[in-house]
UniProtKB/Swiss-Prot annotation:
The modification Pyrrolidone carboxylic acid is found at Q1. The keyword Iron-sulfur does not apply. Its main location: secreted. Keywords: Hypotensive agent, Metalloenzyme inhibitor, Metalloprotease inhibitor, Protease inhibitor, Pyrrolidone carboxylic acid, Secreted, Toxin. It comes from the Eukaryota. The lineage of its organism: Eukaryota, Metazoa, Chordata, Craniata, Vertebrata. One of its GO terms (cellular component) is extracellular region. Belongs to the bradykinin-potentiating peptide family. This peptide both inhibits the activity of the angiotensin-converting enzyme (ACE) and enhances the action of bradykinin by inhibiting the peptidases that inactivate it. It acts as an indirect hypotensive agent. This is Bradykinin-potentiating peptide 11c. GO terms for molecular function: peptidase inhibitor activity; toxin activity. Expressed by the venom gland. The keyword Secreted applies.
Length: 11
């Protein structure tokens, strides 16, 4: 699960 406010941001 991504952090809140993040939308599929590559590492």
């Amino acid at each position: 699960q991504s952090a809140p406010g993040n939308e599929a941001i590559p590492p």
